Amino acid sequence: MTPLKVEDMDRESVVLSFTIPIVNTGRQIGTIMDAFVRTYLPFEQYDKASVTVTLTAADTPRDDGYWQAFIMEIRKPKAFLIKLAIKGKSGNILRDLENFPDMPMDIIYQVVARSDYYYAKTRITLTSEDLRTALYQYTSGVRK
């Protein structure tokens, strides 16, 4: 996983991104027909911001929410690009994210090969420390 990076930020929201490597370890090529990310941040746990996530192939990014299927060659690495749009509720995104908790996310993808298709799931966690580090690096760079 690449480090979390701020793509854009204004007073009320922030867009962050990172990539996750994927490799076909099977014995034949396969196709990723569908993929999406589900975040686990219920408002009972954290209600100061809302999170929207998009997932695309890193080498062919899209911003329309459409998943473009791609072929996975055997042992040839590719990467998923994950973008998080976080919108604060108070009008000050930095204040809203001060106590942002660790946020689990599932990457769910449909694989098709010669056998029947199946869904696979990988869980990753966006830690509050990773978020603070990305925000600090961005805001300190903006001030220079």
Language-model segments: residues:
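Acidic, serine/threonine- and proline-rich intrinsically disordered appendage/tail regions
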Residues: 1, 60-66, 70-77, 95-144
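N-terminal topogenic membrane-targeting module
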Residues: 1-71
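Solvent-exposed residues in well-ordered beta-strands and their adjoining turns
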Residues: 23-25, 40-42, 85-89, 110-112
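Residue-level signal for secondary-structure boundary sites
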Residues: 28, 45, 90-92, 113-117
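Generic structural hydrophobic/aromatic packing signal, biased to beta-strands
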Residues: 35-37, 82-84, 105-109
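Short Pro-Gly-centered flexible turn/kink motifs
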Residues: 74-88
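Short, surface-exposed loop/turn segments at beta-strand-coil junctions that are enriched for proline
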Residues: 87-97
